[in-house]
Amino acid sequence: MGIVVKSFKDQFSSDERLKESNNIIAKYPDRIPVIIEKYSNADLPDMEKNKYLVPRDMTVGHFIHMLSKRMQLDPSKALFVFVHNTLPQTASRMDSLYNTFKEEDGFLYMCYSTEKTFG
């Protein structure tokens, strides 16, 4: 039987998540709190950690590159990230995504996959 990985939202209440994101932003104002989780059907390994403090001026492309290296993906394997079921432009800055898509708990939620389409 496979290990069931609970999502970040299932592990912590909305109040706990809001308190944590507020603490992170107060302590690291130049960074944004990002939760990245594997799309359920993705043929990829789970990451050891799913919570990242990302520089506000980092591009989505740089973030994807960092995730690929962290997962030690074969360079021939493409990695895609989604925000609210949308594939963001790789040139987009993370702070722009955060300002547009952050959730009420103060985190930006993303998922990753090897497929370019969601669903």
UniProtKB/Swiss-Prot annotation:
InterPro entries: Atg8-like (IPR004241), Ubiquitin-like_domsf (IPR029071)
Identification of the protein by name: Autophagy-related protein 8h
Membrane disposition: Lipid-anchor
Presence of the UniProt keyword ATP-binding in the record: no
Induction cue: Induced by sugar starvation.
Swiss-Prot/TrEMBL keywords: Autophagy, Cytoplasm, Cytoplasmic vesicle, Cytoskeleton, Lipoprotein, Membrane, Microtubule, Protein transport, Transport, Ubl conjugation pathway, Vacuole
GO biological process: autophagy; protein transport
Task of the protein: Ubiquitin-like modifier involved in autophagosomes formation. May mediate the delivery of the autophagosomes to the vacuole via the microtubule cytoskeleton.
GO cellular component terms, semicolon-separated: autophagosome; autophagosome membrane; cytoplasmic vesicle; microtubule
Lipidation (Phosphatidylethanolamine amidated glycine): G119
Subunit architecture: Interacts with ATG4. Interacts with ATI1.
Tissue: Constitutively expressed.
Principal cellular location given in the protein's record: membrane
Family to which the UniProt record says this protein belongs: Belongs to the ATG8 family.
KW Transport (keyword) present: yes
